[in-house]
């Protein structure tokens, strides 16, 4: 009788344990499929050795896709490097930012200061680079081709090389239409990208998602940054937020793009020359929420 009683009790304990484990697994599964909402913080992929936190900007009506943008600036980089041997210098001639010839000659302007065309930009190549070596064509973004000869990224592995194969597969290629710059005879440039920068129109999504479009750099970004623009602005003006690039060009220029400002200046949107290496990068992606990847809320 005693043995039978013990066996029954052991069976009940095992049953209770199994039920407890099942409930625990159910809780874990419920967390995994927890519905993603606008403004949520999502952890996905990594860069600079740490996980990337993203914000949900947009969700498709059928809730199978979500547009994400990094919560903070993850790196400081020029949008595009000069094609000349050195920034603002060609054939032994130096061109200041106020140089009349360079400002009037759009081809020369793009050549010595960087080209604002998203399709052929260095930052597009880097963001979509899945390998250690990124193909920049005839001219790579070396330090010498940046405005202050800092933050070159010619030998830095492509952004997507930091992601697993499964994570890359979960990022959907998106057909993008971007306004053309002053050198083009077209109004729009069409590309297909997995990773991209936002446009002026995209900024409206922040308000719809209940989010502030102003942001600051990550600690890892500041450790990597050689320009120290953020620290200078912080020391000089006490700002916490920093500028970050959009992919939209200034139409009457070939070397300027729009960027989001910081909280110090009145203008929320600024124009800047694309060869300036002290502005931030906030990548955006569109992910497949039905993929095998678990998008974890922070």
Predicted segments, located by residue:
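Extracellular/surface recognition and adhesion modules
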Residues: 1-4, 56
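Collagenous Gly-X-Y triple-helix signature in extracellular proteins
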Residues: 28-298
